[in-house]
From Swiss-Prot:
This is Uncharacterized protein YqaM. SUPFAM superfamilies: P-loop containing nucleoside triphosphate hydrolases (SSF52540). InterPro entries: AAA+_ATPase (IPR003593), DnaA_dom (IPR013317), P-loop_NTPase (IPR027417). It comes from the Bacteria. It comes from Bacillus subtilis (strain 168). Pfam families: Bac_DnaA. GO terms for biological process: DNA replication. To B.subtilis YqxC and T.hyodysenteriae hemolysin TlyA.
């Protein structure tokens, strides 16, 4: 009897060990399958569906998210964890039948990446932010330009459909005009998902003329984009503005459309409004009207205002 009892205990032990090995194999197999599945997707969280699903316990409280205008659970667990058995035992699964879904963060990241790619901003320009614009020890006009740019960005949502919905930073080259307007663009794209376009006047005009077959399509894109940044408008060469009749005509066609349809502009130029008015009064007056509430003209000692000549960096 003692021998039979020992055999029974040994058999039971072997059975238990076999069950444990099978459970371990199933668990490892599931983990491997999940790992392999994750590797197949750009986003392991939503599996490229754009939606993340959560399980909510039946006793969980819900509250109103005023920003989303939706009822949101106070606590939740991922669908994947629930299906892997990490949340509860099978007999308790019915307590987790409620679900809550929300857009995956990858959707916003992909949209921002598309907007950045379409904007024409280079990787180097992506680094131009308000936070790395130096104002300490700089002339008041530089500080005024910075404050104007920040204020414009903060006001953008409430003014974007108004007549005075644009900004112009004018005057001294090397004073940070492009940096500040690019910082506005970067923030509009990354934080507000606004479709923006960067148009460097000299290079852009050369491209328009060189690709005449695509001229109208490119001008149409400039007319209709949510926010257009024209950098170095009519940039002078040898003291004379680059403003041929053809160049003025193209800029006029873009600005007229944007003026009539209340579409915001960001403009930098070495010229003042008076100097732009001398080139084309209708064009200059519209720029002035659109930018009236957010305009800074930087004039003075170039050694103090031009960071390429001074010791800004």
């Amino acid at each position: 009897m003692a021998i039979n009892k020992a055999v029974s205990i040994d058999t039971a032990f072997q059975t238990i060990m076999q069950e444990l090995r099978e459970r371990s194999a199933r668990f490892l197999g599931t983990k491997q399958a999940v790992s392999e599945e994750k590797a197949e997707f750009d986003c392991p969280y939503c599996k490229d569906r754009g939606i993340v699903v959560y399980r909510v316990h039946k006793d969980t409280s819900w509250h109103l998210d005023e920003q989303l205008d939706l009822m949101v659970p106070d606590d939740m667990v991922s669908e994947d964890d629930f299906l892997l058995g990490k949340v509860c035992t099978p007999d308790k699964a019915s307590e987790w039948k409620d679900t809550y879904s929300k857009q995956c963060e990858c959707v916003r990241r992909k949209k921002i990446a598309r907007l950045m790619a379409a904007s024409g901003i280079t990787e180097e320009f992506e680094k131009l932010l308000f936070g790395n614009f130096i104002t300490d020890g700089k002339p008041d006009m530089i500080k005024d330009a910075y404050e104007c740019a920040v204020e414009y960005y903060k006001d953008f949502q409430k003014i974007k459909g108004e007549r005075q919905n644009s900004i112009a930073l004018l005057g001294q080259p090397g004073s940070g005009k492009t940096h500040l307007l690019t910082a506005i663009m970067n923030n509009l794209i990354k934080k507000k998902s606004v479709h923006c376009m960067y148009f460097p006047y000299v290079e852009g005009m050369g491209d328009l003329k060189a690709n005449f077959d695509n001229l109208e399509a490119k001008l149409d894109a400039m007319r209709k984009v949510e926010v257009l940044f024209i950098d170095d408008l009519f940039k002078p060469i040898n003291g004379q503005p680059r403003a041929t009749d053809w160049q003025v005509e193209q800029i006029q066609s873009v600005l007229n459309y944007r003026y009539l349809n209340h579409k915001p502009l960001l403009i930098s130029s070495e010229l003042t409004i008076d100097e732009i008015l001398d080139i084309d009064e209708a064009l200059g007056s519209r720029i002035h009207q659109m930018c009236r509430d957010y305009i800074v003209i930087i004039r003075g000692d170039r050694m103090q205002l031009n960071h390429r000549l001074g010791d800004w960096e």
